[in-house]
Every structure is written in structure tokens, then in C-alpha cells.
């Protein structure tokens, strides 16, 4: 069976991930007019820039959908977002600022839940608005086939007939008007935006040029913290975790995790927390650039890692960072539910997150400027009295440290011998100044 259909399957049911925007509206109407039977599925991901979800399925029906459904994905999305925080599943960082993989998390949830809904309706052909140059086409492909082994893929943007007729936004808008729909294109922005309740992605168009900065972006989850005319009040916030799960903000508990994430977004958003500018490697190995918002994820991540460093030992923390980066890359590639990802998730959630219980108080200022004011946990292995520089009872004595240092003589001797060996082979040169060997100029060494 052919998995990817290059041309419209006339007379067959096609499920389309319907956003209500111009692209998917024109695609749905075009498919109906050409003889297919489109079904529209809209994911409620708590997008901060969406005002009326209920209106989206109604529009789909007007444009010719056989049926239109709104699928509430918010609870599952937040669950996956918290899992990513517990595992540190983030691999793209620049200058200490993190991209929280909010779009890949959204695709994992959308790609599975919408296809599951389609399968229930007897719809086994799926289309969405992802382009062939991006990451989403592969993410949706993987998650769709994982959910429904009989799934076939039809994307209007891979169909030359569709492209020839409606290859651009102007053509799509004219097509909608000619078909009797008073569809006006939204004002053209200098970049495109995709969002869910975990975060927002701004990319493409002007942002493809590195001399266009964050300053051209209008945040949808926070404030323009770089603009001195925007007033930002210093704010203290306390975040509490129990067994790796965020449970309270400023002492307030929440009926569900969705409400907690929304409040975390509001708190972090007041400061522009979690906004970053990243150059990343797409799945196809080409580099792209994005500007990201994730105020709630950033707030929870900061508090979580503060507790992590105070509770776990050095090697566990090292494994958390190493495995977290691996897992973040798998998530980015659309492999969040693959066995290798599940193995890493299980280890990190079972042995790392389960011990993270406590409370962290932060002072938030502008953007990513913050201070940690207090850290409280019954599980802390950090004990001030163990290494206090003040006089008092100590867990070990000066004689104990002398013995420990004496044991170091073994590896110091080995290291010194190796350094002299490197001098003999020409990799290092002896120094007449400070007595330490010096690395030879590589070009000079090659000529030897």
C-alpha cells in the first residue's frame, strides 16, 4: 500500500488538521470541490492567540467538511510538557537560554490524538499544512503511522494540481472569495507564528535574516522586555514540586495541571521570561532560526533544576543532563514515543524526578533576569554545616584531608610522567618560564 498519495483521492474520506486559517480553509474547500470527502479535526492546544475555538469547526462545515470535530488536547499537552521538564528534554541552548521544545511537544500530542479521532470516524487518510522543507512533515508522518498503521497521507502542499491552482496566499484568498466566502487575508506579518499553551514559535520571512532581531517580534505570551517604555514590576514567586510534579505557585494549588500551567504562563509572561533566539539544526540537517516564548515552562524548569542540584549527587546530575539532551533531540525529531525515548524517560522520571520535592522562591525582573532567593526541601543533600568555613564540629578532620590528598600522589605522578612522555614525542614543549609543559603550535608540530 502506498503511504503517501501524490494526488487527491477523489470520493474518499480525508481528515484534515484544520486550523481555520487561510491555508487549511482553502485546502478543505478545494478538496470538496474536486470530489473528495473532507473531515475537519481541530486540536485545542490552548493557543494564546486563539480567541474562539468553537467557531473553527463551524467554519469548516461552511467550507464543505462532511463533519468537523474539536479535540481537547490541553491536558495531554501539559502532561507531556511536565514530563519534558522532569527529564530535562531540551537540547537546543544558546548562551544559557533554552528552547523548551514546545512545538515538538505540540506535534506529539496533535499527531496522535487527531489521528486517533480520525480512526474512530473511519477516516484513514490524513492531511495537514506542513511543508516539505520543515520538521513537522516528518513528525506528523511518524506520529500518524504510530497511531494508525493503515494511515495514508495526502498533503495538498505536495500535490502539483493544488499548487498550480492555489500556490500562494493571494491565489487562495481569491479562490475563497470566488467561491462565495468573504475571506480577507490577515495582515501580512514580518514572520510566521505557531503556538500552543506551552510556548510560541516565531520564524521565517524577516526572521530568516540574522540581522533581524527579537525586537521585530510582538510577543503573544509575554511582554517586550527590551523596550524601556514597557513597565515590568519586580516580582517574587514561589514554586513547589512534589515527587517531580509542580503542585503550587505562590502557595496556591490548582484543580488540574492545565490551570497551573496557565498561571505559570501569566507569571512568567509579565516579565518576558523564557524568550530565546536560537539557531538550530532541522531534522534534514539544514540550519534554521527561531525566536521562542515559553514563560511557564521556563519558570517551572528553573525551579526544578534548582531542586535537582541540591538533591542529587554529581554523577546523577551529569546523567540527567546527558540523557536529557539525548531525549530532547529524539523529541525534536518526532520520536517522543519511540522505545529509545521511553527508556530514557522512564529512567529520568523514576530515579531523578521522584526525589524532587521542595519549594523554590525566585525574584523575577526583566526578560530572563532573575535571582533565586530561597530553596527548601526535606530531600536536600546540601547541608551548610558539612563544609562551613566557620569553627565548629566537622564531618571530617584536617588529618582526614591530609590522607585524602596523599592518595592523590598516585595519579599526580602518573600525570607528570605522561607530560614528559608528550615532550619526548614533540606534542608538548618544555617551558623555561613556569616549569609547565606547553602545547606546541600544531602547524609546527606537523612539520616535525
UniProtKB/Swiss-Prot annotation:
Catalytic activity line of the entry? L-citrulline + L-aspartate + ATP = 2-(N(omega)-L-arginino)succinate + AMP + diphosphate + H(+)
From what organism does this protein derive? Answer: Enterobacter sp. (strain 638)
Q: Which positions are annotated as binding L-citrulline?
A: 99, 135, 139, 192, 201, 203, 280
| Subunit details | Homotetramer.
Where found? Cytoplasm
Name by which UniProt lists this protein = Argininosuccinate synthase
Q: Which Gene3D superfamilies does its entry note?
A: 1.10.287.400, Argininosuccinate synthetase, chain A, domain 2 (3.90.1260.10), HUPs (3.40.50.620)
Q: Which NCBIfam families match?
A: argG, PRK05370.1
Q: What is its main location?
A: cytoplasm
Amino acid at each position: 500500500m502506498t503511504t503517501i498519495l501524490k494526488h487527491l483521492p477523489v470520493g474518499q474520506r480525508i481528515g484534515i488538521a484544520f486550523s481555520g486559517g487561510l491555508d487549511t480553509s482553502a485546502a478543505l474547500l478545494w478538496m470538496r470541490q474536486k470530489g473528495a470527502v473532507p473531515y475537519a479535526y481541530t486540536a485545542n492546544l490552548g493557543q494564546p492567540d486563539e480567541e474562539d475555538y468553537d467557531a473553527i469547526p463551524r467554519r469548516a462545515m461552511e467550507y464543505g467538511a462532511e463533519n468537523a470535530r474539536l479535540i481537547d488536547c490541553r491536558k495531554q499537552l501539559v502532561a507531556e510538557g511536565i514530563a519534558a521538564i522532569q527529564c530535562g528534554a531540551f537540547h537546543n541552548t544558546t548562551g544559557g537560554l533554552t528552547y523548551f521544545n514546545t512545538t515538538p511537544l505540540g506535534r506529539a500530542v496533535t499527531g496522535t490524538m487527531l489521528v486517533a479521532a480520525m480512526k474512530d470516524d473511519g477516516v484513514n487518510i490524513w492531511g495537514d499544512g506542513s511543508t516539505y522543507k520543515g520538521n513537522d512533515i516528518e513528525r506528523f508522518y511518524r506520529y500518524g503511522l504510530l497511531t494508525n498503521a493503515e494511515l495514508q497521507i495526502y498533503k495538498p502542499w505536495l500535490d502539483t494540481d493544488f499548487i498550480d491552482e492555489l500556490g500562494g496566499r493571494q491565489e487562495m484568498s481569491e479562490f475563497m472569495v470566488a467561491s462565495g466566502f468573504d475571506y480577507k487575508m490577515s495582515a501580512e506579518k514580518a514572520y510566521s507564528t505557531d503556538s500552543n499553551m506551552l510556548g510560541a514559535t516565531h520564524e521565517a520571512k524577516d526572521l530568516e535574516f540574522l540581522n533581524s532581531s527579537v525586537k521585530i517580534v510582538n510577543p503573544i505570551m509575554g511582554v517586550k522586555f527590551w523596550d524601556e517604555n514597557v513597565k515590568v514590576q519586580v516580582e517574587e514567586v514561589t514554586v513547589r514540586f512534589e515527587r517531580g510534579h509542580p503542585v503550587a505557585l505562590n502557595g496556591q494549588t490548582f484543580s488540574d495541571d492545565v490551570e497551573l500551567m496557565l498561571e505559570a504562563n501569566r507569571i512568567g509572561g509579565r516579565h518576558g521570561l523564557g524568550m530565546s533566539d536560537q539557531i538550530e539544526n532541522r531534522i534534514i540537517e539544514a540550519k534554521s532560526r527561531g525566536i521562542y516564548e515559553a514563560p511557564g515552562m521556563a519558570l517551572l524548569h528553573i525551579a526544578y533544576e534548582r531542586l535537582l542540584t541540591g538533591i542529587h549527587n554529581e554523577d546523577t546530575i551529569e546523567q540527567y543532563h546527558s540523557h536529557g539532551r539525548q531525549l530532547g533531540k529524539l523529541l525534536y525529531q518526532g520520536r517522543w514515543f519511540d522505545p529509545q525515548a521511553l527508556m530514557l524517560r522512564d529512567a529520568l522520571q523514576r530515579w531523578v524526578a521522584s526525589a524532587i520535592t521542595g519549594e523554590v522562591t525566585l525574584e523575577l525582573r526583566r526578560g530572563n533576569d532573575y535571582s533565586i532567593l530561597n530553596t527548601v526541601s526535606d530531600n536536600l543533600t546540601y547541608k551548610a554545616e558539612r563544609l562551613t568555613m566557620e569553627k565548629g564540629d566537622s564531618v571530617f578532620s584536617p588529618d582526614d584531608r591530609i590522607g585524602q590528598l596523599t592518595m592523590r600522589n598516585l595519579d599526580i605522578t602518573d600525570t607528570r610522567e605522561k607530560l614528559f612522555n608528550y615532550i619526548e614525542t614533540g606534542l608538548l614543549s618544555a617551558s623555561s618560564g613556569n616549569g609547565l609543559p606547553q602545547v606546541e603550535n600544531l602547524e609546527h608540530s606537523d612539520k616535525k
